[in-house]
Amino acid sequence: MSSGGLLLLLGLLTLWAELTPISSRERHPDCDKPPDTGRCGNNVRAFYYKPSTNKCVQFIYGGCNANGNHFKSDHLCRCQCREND
């Protein structure tokens, strides 16, 4: 197989791994932690996962010292935490 073919195969495998539904992967343990705004005084829009509703919810993140249940975007939150319906 040529090097171009190997690169294409590697790219397809990487894409497949990224697009694998969350149901076939374990949810990140931080997703079950309560939301924590952090201790700094910044006002950064962020998202946290709410297990009781299986949704990502927007909140204001202070910018530091929070737990892992905060994400820069709704998309990142859903990719890490949300269960498929």
From Swiss-Prot:
Keywords of this protein's UniProt record, alphabetized? Disulfide bond, Ion channel impairing toxin, Neurotoxin, Potassium channel impairing toxin, Presynaptic neurotoxin, Secreted, Signal, Toxin, Voltage-gated potassium channel impairing toxin
Which InterPro entries does the record associate with it? Kunitz_BPTI, Kunitz_BPTI_sf, Prtase_inh_Kunz-CS, TFPI/VKTCI-like
Q: Which domain of life is it from?
A: Eukaryota
Can you give the residue ranges of the BPTI/Kunitz inhibitor domain? 31-81
**Subcellular location as annotated:** Secreted
List S-S links within the chain. Answer: C31-C81, C40-C64, C56-C77
What is the purpose of this protein? Beta-1-bungarotoxin is a presynaptic neurotoxin of the venom. The B chain is homologous to venom basic protease inhibitors but has no protease inhibitor activity and blocks voltage-gated potassium channels (Kv).
Q: How does it assemble?
A: Heterodimer; disulfide-linked. The A chains have phospholipase A2 activity and the B chains show homology with the basic protease inhibitors.
**Per its record, how is this protein called by name?**
Kunitz-type serine protease inhibitor homolog beta-bungarotoxin BF B2 chain
What are the leading ranks of the lineage?
A: Eukaryota, Metazoa, Chordata, Craniata, Vertebrata
